[in-house]
């Protein structure tokens, strides 16, 4: 059994919104397996869904540069949100994305190297660490982008259609954050997990019902799950009566890909314990 650490409990709490003790109990019951703990909590009716894995705590900004045929999206991290709003930081981010686009970079390493001198100057000036974290270049027949503030950036590529359509779909992706483009991309394992959760959650409702009825109920849940998880099956945010895939098809377009960046995805930022900090300061003062 995996050790039930405070970090593991914290992650489960962030993903489910449940209390610390409930999360610890669920993890203990699941033998330290966080995914099983989430499934068990969903099956018991404690939660309806869980956030995607990944602690989101780092600050910074997302930046995009595009010309309708190609785009570069980057993430630059800072230690505080205050710095991310300052002109010096914004100028560094803007210069970095311009450099990445102009040089047609496809990997973050050359950008980090090229911007290192400017980064050191910025760090020396603001007294806070700054890092270029990631970069992706996307090319296609039609490329549209959407930036939500400076925290979420999306790039969508189409075959056919126009840039405005790609931008509309990119805005939808920013709002809904789908996991997949097509239902066919959802793994059999994920579908099986969803099926098992549904059966456990509705155990009383399906008890005694004919197998074919249960099968229809499960099928309905899986259809809904696939619609929620895949972009082409989602209801378009600007017109919920139309699916995103149908929107593209009506315009004579095909969605080829989407890229979603959110500041801090997958980064765990240490959280200072105020009580411990005060205790440490008092101890130091006595020395």
Curated annotation (Swiss-Prot):
Keywords: Cytoplasm, Elongation factor, Protein biosynthesis. It comes from the Bacteria. SUPFAM superfamilies: Elongation factor Ts (EF-Ts), dimerisation domain, UBA-like. InterPro entries: EF-Ts_dimer_sf, Transl_elong_EFTs/EF1B, Transl_elong_EFTs/EF1B_dimer, Transl_elong_Ts_CS, UBA-like_sf. Residues 80-83 are annotated as: Involved in Mg(2+) ion dislocation from EF-Tu. Gene3D superfamilies: 1.10.286.20, DNA helicase RuvA subunit, C-terminal domain, Elongation factor Ts, dimerisation domain. GO terms for cellular component: cytoplasm. Coiled coil: none annotated. It is found in: Cytoplasm. GO terms for molecular function: translation elongation factor activity. Belongs to the EF-Ts family. Associates with the EF-Tu.GDP complex and induces the exchange of GDP to GTP. It remains bound to the aminoacyl-tRNA.EF-Tu.GTP complex up to the GTP hydrolysis stage on the ribosome. This is Elongation factor Ts. It comes from Pseudomonas syringae pv. syringae (strain B728a).
């Amino acid at each position: 059994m995996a050790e039930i650490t405070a970090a593991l409990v914290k992650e489960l709490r962030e993903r489910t919104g449940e209390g610390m003790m409930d999360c610890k109990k669920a993890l203990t019951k699941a033998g330290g397996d966080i995914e099983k703990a989430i499934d068990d909590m969903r099956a018991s009716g404690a939660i309806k869904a869980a956030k995607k894995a990944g602690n989101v705590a780092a600050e910074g900004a997302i930046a995009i540069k595009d010309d309708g045929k190609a785009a570069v999206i980057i993430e630059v991290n800072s230690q505080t949100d205050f710095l991310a709003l300052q002109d010096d930081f914004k100028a560094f981010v803007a210069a970095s994305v311009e450099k990445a686009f102009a040089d047609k970079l496809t990997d973050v390493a050359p950008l980090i190297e090229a911007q290192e001198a400017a980064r050191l100057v910025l760090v020396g000036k603001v007294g806070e660490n700054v890092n270029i974290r990631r970069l992706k270049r996307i090319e296609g027949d039609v490329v549209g982008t959407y930036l939500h503030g400076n925290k979420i950036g999306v790039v969508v590529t189409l075959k056919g259609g126009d840039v405005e359509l790609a931008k509309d779909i990119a805005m939808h992706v920013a709002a809904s954050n789908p996991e997949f483009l097509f239902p066919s991309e959802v793994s059999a394992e994920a579908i099986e997990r969803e099926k098992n959760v549904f059966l456990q959650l509705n155990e009383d409702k399906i008890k005694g019902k004919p197998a074919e009825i249960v099968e229809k109920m499960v099928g309905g849940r899986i259809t809904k799950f696939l619609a929620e998880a895949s972009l082409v099956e989602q209801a378009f945010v600007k017109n919920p009566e139309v699916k995103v895939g149908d929107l593209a098809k009506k315009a004579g377009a095909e969605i080829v890909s989407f890229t979603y960046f959110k500041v801090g995805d997958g980064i765990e930022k240490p959280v200072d314990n105020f009580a411990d900090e005060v205790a440490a300061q008092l101890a130091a003062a006595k020395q």
